[in-house]
């Protein structure tokens, strides 16, 4: 990617993690040079060790929304909860109490069906878990561990660096989980 000062190109990577809700351990990682997250959901799920059980449900933010991700997760027997767009903040009471309405028709678009699914009580509860599962892990890696950029060049070396960062996070987390309170 060309930088803004016309001084050459910057390499940018897109790092992904799959985090277990109850343990908040990183279960799988992936790294790509894709400009957005859409093509990274399925490779990250596929990176999950076969000895671990696959998740039954997966909550993803709107950067992952695509028909191919929905179909791919369903084909892996994973129920997707993927935001279809930005969620409005500070909604009025009228909007919050608005009725759910009728379910979309069978021939409705994937976006309409997913938007309805996320408006159900089960959908809201499941999507809400994403905020307290994945986001704190990323925040700890960036703020507490101070990892904000890759120091090695090339995607293979950067991927190794990302795995080491995630292993370091998991060691810190395991220490918290097994330490007596």
Predicted regions and their residues:
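Anion-binding and metal-coordination hotspots
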Residues: 1-181
């Amino acid at each position: 990617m060309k930088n803004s000062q016309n001084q050459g190109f910057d390499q940018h990577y897109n790092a992904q993690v799959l985090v277990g809700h109850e343990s908040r351990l990183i279960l799988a990682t992936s790294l790509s040079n894709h400009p957005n997250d859409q093509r990274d959901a399925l490779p990250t799920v596929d990176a999950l060790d076969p000895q671990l059980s696959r998740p039954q449900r997966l909550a993803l933010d709107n950067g992952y929304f695509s028909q191919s991700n929905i179909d791919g997760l369903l084909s892996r027997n994973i129920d997707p909860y993927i935001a279809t767009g930005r969620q409005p903040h500070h909604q009025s009471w009228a909007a919050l109490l608005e009725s759910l309405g009728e379910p979309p028709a069978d021939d409705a678009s994937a976006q309409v069906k997913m938007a309805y699914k996320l408006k159900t009580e089960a959908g809201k509860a499941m999507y809400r878990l994403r905020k307290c599962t994945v986001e704190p892990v990323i925040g700890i890696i960036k703020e507490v561990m101070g990892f904000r950029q890759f120091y090695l060049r090339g995607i293979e070396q950067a991927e190794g660096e990302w795995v080491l960062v995630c292993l370091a996070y998991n060691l810190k987390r395991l220490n918290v989980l097994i330490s007596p309170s």
